[in-house]
């Protein structure tokens, strides 16, 4: 029997305890806050672990890390990035291409905390209506950004990039960034469920393409154990990725292979029947 969205995870907490039902959420928040702290430790305490912001940085003043989308924009705009930027982009692309689908979105992006809060409040308030927006729109926006940069010769996305703006806001003050975050929060809360991350964000679209063949995947252990409580669907920011592995035909894979999965592990947390686990794309046991 399907549970109400506002009670998602309750059965898991009652059966296995709070830690089991929230462990991946806890580790994700710790990861996001730790990375943010590494950026802020320099400006606030003079300890430069990550120098820069989410668009581009230096780890320990040695290892370059560059946002692949910004790098692609630069190339499209015919502004050849320096060697350090290209190396940094290559490191990021290789890391996420191997590690897991959209791991940046679920484990690094600070904006994920804002959109997750909107999704949680939406469930608690029982808001069910949502605007019908194609999930493919984000890929269209990604293409338009690159085309726009090519035509204009400018890095158009950096004018409005809320992820980079949020990182800078903790140092320079929120100002207009605070209003931008409020708009995204209210959009997700009142207009479209998972509207920003699930339908519009071109950064997530870029990481989806990068991690399309990545190693780490969510796997359904045993479809027969599913009791159709719908808790996993209610908490998943990309619920469509669960349909085939969980309720697909017998010959369909038990792995969540969609590039839209953000590898957050919330489906594992909230499932009282322990239907899901983290595995690799090469795990075909049970099929």
From Swiss-Prot:
Cofactor detail note: Binds 2 [4Fe-4S] cluster.
Residues that hold [4Fe-4S] cluster 1 according to the record: 226, 229, 232, 236
Physiological role: Required for electron transfer from ubiquinol, via NapC, to the periplasmic nitrate reductase NapAB complex.
Periplasmic topological domain residue ranges: 51-79, 161-170
Record-linked PANTHER family: FERREDOXIN-TYPE PROTEIN NAPH (PTHR30176:SF3)
Residue ranges occupied by any 4Fe-4S ferredoxin-type domain in the UniProt entry: 217-247, 252-281
Localization terms from the record: Cell inner membrane
Single Gene Ontology MF annotation: metal ion binding
Protein name: Ferredoxin-type protein NapH
Transmembrane region(s): 30-50, 80-100, 140-160, 171-191
Cofactor(s) annotated in UniProt: [4Fe-4S] cluster
Main localization of the protein described in the UniProt heading: membrane
GO cellular component, one term: plasma membrane
Gene label: napH
PROSITE patterns named in the record: 4FE4S_FER_1, 4FE4S_FER_2
Topological region Cytoplasmic: 1-29, 101-139, 192-287
Highest taxon of source: Bacteria
Native source organism of the sequence: Haemophilus influenzae (strain ATCC 51907 / DSM 11121 / KW20 / Rd)
